[in-house]
Amino acid sequence: MTKQLSTSPKQDGFRMPAEHEPQSAIWMAWPERTDNWRYGAKPAQATFVEVAKAIAKTTPVTMVVSAEQFENARVVLPSYIQVLEMSTDDSWMRDIGPSYVVNDHGKRRGVDWHFNALGQIGDGLYSPWDKDDAVARKVCETLGDDSYRAPIVLEGGSIHVDGEGTLYTTEECLLHPSRNPDLTREEIEDVLKVTLSIEKVIWIPQGLYNDETNGHVDNLIHVVRPGEIALTWCDDETDPQYLISRKAMDVLLTETDAKGRQIKIHKLPMPGPLYISEDEANGVDVSEGMERVPGERLAGSYANYLISNEHIIYPLLDEKHDKDVAMLLAKLYPNYEVTGVNAREILLGGGNIHCITQQIPKV
């Protein structure tokens, strides 16, 4: 029987491992919302299938699906992908799934953050969100893992860790008034240190331009390994992303990580700019949530890739850059397999490959 614990991971000797550490599984959630995923979510579902198949080359995949969509998902997903019935409000498993922590004795536990659909009523992306807020605990229950209910609102995509004491985030997101308005920056840092056993938080000012998540860090950077960061870069000084990336670089170059290392930066080219077409916008049902407007700029980023057991699964977003990014990733991760998946449908929904996946560490 699993328990929701009243202690803290730091108190119990647990830490959050980095994404490049060994994993036992990747969890995903099936896209279904017709007010976010165009044409009845069918194009997005086809893309999620391709992402799951790519991941499954090196890591088992579990896809959670509603009762209504279970048969459909089971038919279109390969038999080696586990399909599990679970209620959700949307399909951003990075944000709604548990952030796992591990100890030195082969044990793991989940961290269950409070979730409010990226800003609750008025500023959030959808309502209600109670099913999504329950997903992390359900995942832990299913896997037989104890969990901690963290005392703050946080999405998994708003943090990156290096596994050696350093956490990266953005001021834009974690200090946004729609998340934890009663907490100061220092108080949020204290919670992160106790909950994930990290020693240092590196605050990047902003996330990617026009990112509806209020600037999730996983759409701007990725931790390559301790002391090394892949950063979305824009050379066009007239583009709003230019200053955002420049400010991020300035912070990273002046900071040291928890171990005192200077941070090495690898520039990832920015795709596009990419914009939503009239056909793409018109295929989405109207609701009170996030509106899709023809001509609106999409928050496309190659940093939104997944590392899973010496395998990089990255989004194909722009033919002008896709191959160059593949070569750069192969250089950054020697001896890793690099797989690109056409990911525009995920981008149209507001995220990308990292956003729709959540790793379970191997212990």
UniProtKB/Swiss-Prot annotation:
InterPro entries: Agmatine_deiminase, Peptidyl-Arg-deiminase_porph. It is an enzyme of class 3 (hydrolase). It comes from Photobacterium profundum (strain SS9). Signal peptide: none annotated. It comes from the Bacteria. One of its GO terms (molecular function) is protein-arginine deiminase activity. This is Putative agmatine deiminase. It holds the Pfam family PAD_porph. Gene3D superfamilies: L-arginine/glycine Amidinotransferase, Chain A. Residues 1-20 are annotated as: Disordered.
